[in-house]
Amino acid sequence: MASEAKESPANNPGLSTVRDEATKGYIMQQTMFRVKDPKASLDFYSRVLGMSLLKRLDFSEMKFSLYFLGYEDTSTAPTDPTERTVWTFGRPATIELTHNWGTESDPEFKGYHNGNSEPRGFGHIGVTVDDVHKACERFEQLGVEFVKKPHDGKMKNIAFIKDPDGYWIEIFDLKTIGTTAGNAA
């Protein structure tokens, strides 16, 4: 007799398998990072990771800006500002960079907590690439800081890099992730 899948309700107390009709149109839309310097962060997410800037919102009264980035073709995005905002908020899996004005030039500013030191909390985001080893060779040439390279540690073929604010980004590919995570499957 086959055992229950790890993803089954029997193996996951609290898991609801009945999707409420009210949640039918929900998507995971964004993860927000606070950033010290938008110039450094925009360079990293666009040039290093290949994301596009989907929308920028400036809140001058509150002195902060939001930058939404993702893996979208912006050539067909609306040009009307309101329509572009709605379009952006309809894209799945975007990164929202929040910049509180002045942090980039404030010598007293100590930076933000990335969640990977005590007290631990948020861990990382993940980016799928075509080939984890080739991507990491490129990242190395670009001077990206690594937490873990694909050949390090017990879990091979995955890497962790840091963005300019120290947030961790897991890098993996679909060719190897199944075997890398195979023992946990």
Curated annotation (Swiss-Prot):
<feature type="binding site">
    <location>
        <begin position="154"/>
        <end position="155"/>
    </location>
    <ligand>
        <name>substrate</name>
    </ligand>
</feature>
<dbReference type="InterPro" id="IPR037523">
    <property type="entry name" value="VOC"/>
</dbReference>
<dbReference type="GO" id="GO:0046872">
    <property type="term" value="F:metal ion binding"/>
</dbReference>
<feature type="domain" description="VOC">
    <location>
        <begin position="27"/>
        <end position="174"/>
    </location>
</feature>
<feature type="binding site">
    <location>
        <position position="120"/>
    </location>
    <ligand>
        <name>substrate</name>
    </ligand>
</feature>
<feature type="binding site">
    <location>
        <position position="170"/>
    </location>
    <ligand>
        <name>Zn(2+)</name>
    </ligand>
</feature>
<feature type="region of interest" description="Disordered">
    <location>
        <begin position="1"/>
        <end position="21"/>
    </location>
</feature>
<keyword id="KW-0479">Metal-binding</keyword>
<comment type="pathway">
    <text>Secondary metabolite metabolism; methylglyoxal degradation; (R)-lactate from methylglyoxal: step 1/2.</text>
</comment>
<dbReference type="GO" id="GO:0009651">
    <property type="term" value="P:response to salt stress"/>
</dbReference>
<feature type="active site" description="Proton donor/acceptor">
    <location>
        <position position="170"/>
    </location>
</feature>
<dbReference type="GO" id="GO:0004462">
    <property type="term" value="F:lactoylglutathione lyase activity"/>
</dbReference>
<feature type="binding site">
    <location>
        <position position="124"/>
    </location>
    <ligand>
        <name>Zn(2+)</name>
    </ligand>
</feature>
<feature type="binding site">
    <location>
        <position position="96"/>
    </location>
    <ligand>
        <name>Zn(2+)</name>
    </ligand>
</feature>
<feature type="binding site">
    <location>
        <position position="124"/>
    </location>
    <ligand>
        <name>substrate</name>
    </ligand>
</feature>
<comment type="similarity">
    <text>Belongs to the glyoxalase I family.</text>
</comment>
<keyword id="KW-0862">Zinc</keyword>
<dbReference type="GO" id="GO:0009414">
    <property type="term" value="P:response to water deprivation"/>
</dbReference>
<keyword id="KW-0456">Lyase</keyword>
<feature type="binding site">
    <location>
        <position position="30"/>
    </location>
    <ligand>
        <name>substrate</name>
    </ligand>
</feature>
<feature type="binding site">
    <location>
        <position position="30"/>
    </location>
    <ligand>
        <name>Zn(2+)</name>
    </ligand>
</feature>
<protein>
    <recommendedName>
        <fullName>Lactoylglutathione lyase</fullName>
        <ecNumber>4.4.1.5</ecNumber>
    </recommendedName>
</protein>
<dbReference type="Pfam" id="PF00903">
    <property type="entry name" value="Glyoxalase"/>
</dbReference>
<dbReference type="InterPro" id="IPR004361">
    <property type="entry name" value="Glyoxalase_1"/>
</dbReference>
<feature type="binding site">
    <location>
        <position position="34"/>
    </location>
    <ligand>
        <name>substrate</name>
    </ligand>
</feature>
<dbReference type="InterPro" id="IPR004360">
    <property type="entry name" value="Glyas_Fos-R_dOase_dom"/>
</dbReference>
<dbReference type="InterPro" id="IPR018146">
    <property type="entry name" value="Glyoxalase_1_CS"/>
</dbReference>
<comment type="function">
    <text>Catalyzes the conversion of hemimercaptal, formed from methylglyoxal and glutathione, to S-lactoylglutathione.</text>
</comment>
<feature type="binding site">
    <location>
        <position position="100"/>
    </location>
    <ligand>
        <name>substrate</name>
    </ligand>
</feature>
<dbReference type="InterPro" id="IPR029068">
    <property type="entry name" value="Glyas_Bleomycin-R_OHBP_Dase"/>
</dbReference>
